[in-house]
Amino acid sequence: MTRPFNRVHLIVMDSVGIGEAPDAADFKDEGSHTLRHTLEGFDQTLPNLEKLGLGNIDKLPVVNAVEQPEAYYTKLSEASVGKDTMTGHWEIMGLNIMQPFKVYPNGFPEELIQQIEEMTGRKVVANKPASGTQIIDEWGEHQMKTGDLIVYTSADPVLQIAAHEDIIPLEELYDICEKVRELTKDPKYLIGRIIARPYVGEPGNFTRTSNRHDYALKPFGKTVLDHLKDGGYDVIAIGKINDIYDGEGVTEAVRTKSNMDGMDQLMKIVKKDFTGISFLNLVDFDALYGHRRDKPGYAQAIKDFDDRLPELFSNLKEDDLVIITADHGNDPTAPGTDHTREYIPVIMYSPKFKGGHALESDTTFSSIGATIADNFNVTLPEFGKSYLKELK
């Protein structure tokens, strides 16, 4: 069977939601709209996303609706019960998560902390939700003096362990995180990821290094990535994609340091010869701007991404398909620091399209995975609807 597209390049703009989901009230997220609220008052345009049809999905500041969009577009709602990165990505590739991962707004249970201390022989300090930079400013000097483990969490279902690289060598920190991953597989904890967060520097001038490592749970079933890999296709994971799926279904993993580095890595991969998918997560939208409620920074990051699209498109082959989407919302104007339950935008573009139009929106994140699976003639996910026949 001939494939309409030899390669699919899937880009997740982490947290760039496009309006409250139908069940937003269940998550106390009524009125959330990451894109609209981020772009309100922004004094620059997004000409490339506009041409593709982003402004046709929903009314947005600085992004107009266009009469002849160059891409197909829609918005999708989440069927799974969480609004975290892992849940969103797993659903994109065909899994629905009906038991949510747990978040720990008051820190982790004393029982778990004691287990970590006994297992590692090191005391645990902090044990609260915090930003990574804030927590090392607060506890970094103490950690250097004592060798204690700085354990903290966020609005996500994660347990993070920070340590100075000169005090706890990377290999030891990674080993500790692997052991904590095993501990927290106990269903009573339901923690999505354990994250090693090494840092360097002196008191008052600490910086986190790029030696971060995530220890995820393995997806509880086969995803579209597994079916692609089993079918002999390339699955190139860029950024934190490899960690999100714990390496399952991935044939090559490329690390990134930032959104722009992620785009640089994607450009290199687009110029390579392969058949299958590249799958890029651009985490800065979420980690640097959404959680920190930095609206101007968030808007500028979207502009920086928009600026890179002509370079990407000029390097595409005729039978390439680019899908731009998100995994949840993180409205920088919402109260608190948590993700927001939102629709995700979906834009599908190929050089061979003569133009595009709206696609059905009454379906779920898994429609992205279904479209990719359908293209490569591998097992379709149980959920979602393939748009492949409409992409002409």
Swiss-Prot record:
Residues binding Mn(2+) 2, per UniProt: D286, H291, H339
GO cellular component, one term: cytosol
InterPro entries for the chain: Alkaline_phosphatase_core_sf, DeoB, Metalloenzyme, Phosphopentomutase_DeoB_cap_sf
Cofactor(s) for this UniProt protein: Mn(2+)
Annotated EC: 5.4.2.7
Keyword Amino-acid biosynthesis: no
SUPFAM superfamilies: Alkaline phosphatase-like, DeoB insert domain-like
Family from the record: Belongs to the phosphopentomutase family.
Record-linked HAMAP family: Phosphopentomut (MF_00740)
Name under which the protein is recorded: Phosphopentomutase
